[in-house]
């Protein structure tokens, strides 16, 4: 399903921050990338998601998802893939929500970015997803701010 072959990631003309990284992941597997702060965990995942910041680039190697190289993806390809087929869960995921916007509006925006649907339908889908996670009172969560 996901195969990373001899990955090297570089920022600008500096020496690569990641070198010779390999990973093979089969369907149904859950993998955690663990390491010290600054060891390149986030850089590897950002490379897999095509989301390296600034001058970051894959200098060598390949990243295959279902046998297709992700390095050839267009921005449109990435939009279709991210969040629906492949995603990242941050260690401190609470920091990814805007603290001055309600959770529901952010969740709906995210769903609509990845799936063409009306906001009302996206809201219902979000409530359903929260309920499936057995979170109490999904509607209340959607109407709350991240800090509540």
Predicted regions and their residues:
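Q-loop/switch helix immediately C-terminal to the Walker
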Residues: 92, 99-113, 125
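Conserved ABC ATPase "signature" region
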Residues: 121-140
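The feature captures the beta-strand-to-loop junction immediately N-terminal to the Walker
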Residues: 34-36
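ABC ATPase NBD coupling module
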Residues: 70-87, 105, 113
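Conserved ABC transporter NBD signature motif
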Residues: 57-69
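Conserved beta-strand
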Residues: 4-7, 16-31, 61
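Conserved A-loop
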Residues: 11-12, 52, 65, 72
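Short, conserved post-Walker A segment of ABC-type ATPase nucleotide-binding domains
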Residues: 31, 42-55
């Amino acid at each position: 399903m996901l195969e990373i072959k001899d990955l090297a990631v570089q920022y600008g003309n500096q020496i690569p921050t990641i070198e010779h990284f390999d990973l093979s992941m089969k369907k149904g597997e859950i993998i955690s990338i663990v390491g010290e702060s600054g060891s390149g965990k986030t850089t590897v995942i950002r490379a897999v998601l095509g989301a390296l910041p600034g001058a970051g680039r894959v200098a060598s190697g390949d990243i295959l998802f279902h046998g297709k190289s992700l390095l050839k993806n267009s921005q449109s390809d990435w939009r279709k893939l991210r969040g629906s087929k492949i995603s990242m869960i941050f260690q401190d995921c609470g920091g990814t929500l805007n603290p001055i916007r309600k959770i529901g509006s952010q969740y709906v925006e995210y769903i609509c970015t990845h799936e063409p649907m009306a906001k009302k339908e996206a809201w219902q889908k979000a409530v359903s997803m929260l309920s499936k996670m057995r979170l109490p009172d999904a509607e209340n969560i959607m109407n709350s701010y991240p800090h509540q």
